[in-house]
Amino acid sequence: MVQRWIDWNTDTGSELVDIGTHKLHIACLGPPRKLGDPAVLIVPGLGSSITGWAAVRRQLAQVIRVYSYDRTGYGESDTGIEAPSSIMIAHELDLLLRKAQISPPLIVVAHSWGGILSREFLALRSGDVAGMVFVEANQEHTLDILDWRLLANSPVLTGVDRDKVHNIENLHKLNKEEWEIYQTTEASDKHQKQAALEYEQYPKSFPVLEAKSQLEQQPPILRSRPVCVIKGDNGRDFQKLFQAGIEKGNGSESERVAFEDVLTTWDVKDQALQRGNLKLSSRQKYFEVPFSGHNLQLTAPDAVVSGVKWVIENIE
């Protein structure tokens, strides 16, 4: 039996929760929650810790209870023995919520690969999800149509300082302490090792989700529960990286052409892919945040909060 020091419905704080095989770290912020009140659950992207969501959590906690957690191997959570597949991650999240006795309804906020992970969680607990916010999120056809890894691993980007090009250090909206914690956490050996394990599992997760045919279900799997999709500007990020690579003299002519060919149709394909997640519900909202890059939780937390507030307002 888990010894609980925190009442997850009324207290704020964080704790390690034993899910049987190991312990996961979970934190909660925001006003006390009565039975039946919705709460936000944040699912970060590939190789990402929850520390990058500090500004979003801080703002959301003014209006709603917010739960966030470190996946296996990240932050204060234990390392695990199982490969971090999308199925395993969703299973562990389900266990965590049950062990901590955190009840639905939940508004799931998912970023990047979190789009895949959150929908595996949806497959487990579709009745417990009151709404969803997809932030620059993947879906099952992402790698088939727009495999960003072809650009990320291109010789054109050899030696390019990606953080410097993205200028996140000057664009982020974290406070000084939050930024320092974020940098320290994500630079740690523990974090990097777990991120590498997730990268191995990443491509395997897409056909697994596709087999569930969630986007084809009628009526939609969430019926009229609200879904908001927020698109950033990842294509602009890659365009800036491309220019930096060219300035370094990187890549052969054919490699440069191949890179530019992907960028030419990036926005059209990216928009269609991200809009695809709207098929999960008949109640939908879509908007874009120009000049924000991929990591809106860092550069445009206000936009994420706006999407969550729309979901709150549209829960029946």
Please tell me what each predicted stretch does.
Residues 52-54, 77-83, 144-146:
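Conserved catalytic-core motifs of eukaryotic protein kinase domains, centered on the activation segment
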Residues 22-76, 124:
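Conserved HGGG/HGGXW glycine-rich cap/lid loop of the alpha/beta-hydrolase fold
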Residues 103-146:
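Conserved hydrolase catalytic core segment
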Residues 4-23:
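N-terminal cap/lid segment of alpha/beta-hydrolase-fold proteins
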Residues 174-288:
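Conserved serine/cysteine hydrolase catalytic core
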Residues 272, 279-316:
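Catalytic active-site module of serine/aspartate enzymes centered on a nucleophile-bearing elbow/loop
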Residues 133-166, 204-209:
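Flexible "cap/lid" loop of the alpha/beta hydrolase fold
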Residues 29, 33, 71-107:
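Active-site loop/oxyanion-hole signature of alpha/beta-hydrolase fold enzymes
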